[in-house]
Design a protein with these regions (language model features):
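PRPP-associated nucleotide enzymes
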Residues: 1-157
Length: 157
């Protein structure tokens, strides 16, 4: 949401298909949505190139997949990730979140095989309110973590 960047009214994951929260985007102009979608697609593509470092995308078909995020307010970013993963036909899809409001948990649970959410507060303002430091990860931090997974252990489905 312009001016409230932590509140996701939509998201774009790998593959570029936008997922919009229709209830929230009614306050955003079509031009803003189109421009933001183009900008976010470019950023997702940039991150994929940087983070993969020439490695192919991991095949998820027939695999068990666990999607993890630092929390979900509207669930838009997680819905985009779910959509991107579902397109690859995993055997099982689990979402794990430390914090999300009840309505978001209920909505996400309908889209996955299992939803794990540690804290589901009745009163919820933002994901960041539950963290002492809610700074975003830098590209360098992400690359360092991914580099440590050069030869990840494969676990059966």
């Amino acid at each position: 949401m312009p001016g409230h960047e932590e509140l996701a009214v939509g998201a774009v994951a790998s593959g570029g298909i936008p997922v919009l929260n229709r209830q929230e985007v009614r306050f955003v102009s079509d031009n803003q949505i189109e421009e933001t979608t183009r900008r976010v697609r470019r950023e997702v593509e940039r991150q994929e190139v940087l983070y993969r470092k020439g490695r192919p995308a991991r095949r998820l078909t027939g695999q068990s997949v666990i999607l993890v995020d630092d929390g979900a307010a509207t669930g838009a970013t997680m819905r985009a990730a779910i959509s991107a993963v579902r397109a690859q036909q995993p055997a099982r899809l689990v979402v794990a979140l430390p914090i999300a409001p009840p309505e978001t948990c209920a909505s996400l649970a309908k889209s996955v095989d299992e939803l794990i959410c540690l804290i589901v507060p009745k009163v919820f303002f933002s994901v960041g309110q539950w963290y002492d430091d809610f700074s975003p990860c830098t590209d360098d931090e992400v690359c360092e973590l991914l580099d440590g997974l050069e030869n990840p252990v494969e676990v059966g489905t």
